[in-house]
Amino acid sequence: MLKKKNQFDYLNLSHVLSKKKNSGGGWINKISDKLSEINVAEYQVVSKHSNYLFYSRFGLLDTFVYFLFFLCFFLNNVLFLAGVFHTKQFTFNEVNGFNQFYLFWTVEKPTDIIQASITYQISQYGIANLVFGLISLALLVFLSFRWTVSLFFKSQTTKWERIGYTTGFFISIVVYLLWILLMVLFLVLLDQQFFERDTQKIQSATRFSLFFNVENNNGVYLSKLNSFGVFATAWAISLVFYSFFFIAIFAFNYNKTKLKQLFKKSKAK
């Protein structure tokens, strides 16, 4: 049950909403009215059910988006790490070995190894990795928007909890946006500056892509992460662990009332 102060806020919001519906206005006012309707509906549900997240269509939407974000967030980073650690050694005289060297790109080996250039194209694996990242970023922005406008969330948290969660959300958006930009650069930018296409230069150069160096051992080429690749890999690993932090936040808020009751009982004893 909400506190009296929060009930007053919602009832006052309902009173304002009844005035706004006949006020007309442009699309901004219509959006504002719709958001007010959602907030009033949230109050009507939470006043009857303590488990708002599973009894309200708005709560179900928030819960669904939350776990969909976690899934896409997790898969994006796991796919990247799997692709990074999947690299194998290859030689230029193999028929198919060179094509399987990276999961992120489809590599067309030229017939004339000495004179021709290698063609790179992002693979379905690389596209899937990028799509999961873009979807999770969009979902994170949506969750941050819901956190900002929802009076239900504001009523269920203290001032310092709201400050902490809001700060965490926006920091997460910035960090994850930088990560997605890095993925776009890594997967999509098939520029000569980053990806060596001339086979003669590959045999003497060490940098094969943005994240990898290639060592030549008597015609056998072995890929290793360069310093930038190590940094990106460490970043991805930290994001995998960070994704579980969102599950912890959800579990804490879902059980916060019960946890407070247990804490009070243990303190009373």
Swiss-Prot record:
It is found in: Cell membrane. The keyword Membrane applies. The chain crosses the membrane at residues 64-84, 125-145, 169-189, 230-250. Its main location: membrane. GO terms for cellular component: plasma membrane. It is a multi-pass membrane protein. Keywords: Cell membrane, Membrane, Transmembrane, Transmembrane helix. This is Uncharacterized protein MG323.1. The lineage of its organism: Bacteria, Bacillati, Mycoplasmatota, Mycoplasmoidales, Mycoplasmoidaceae.
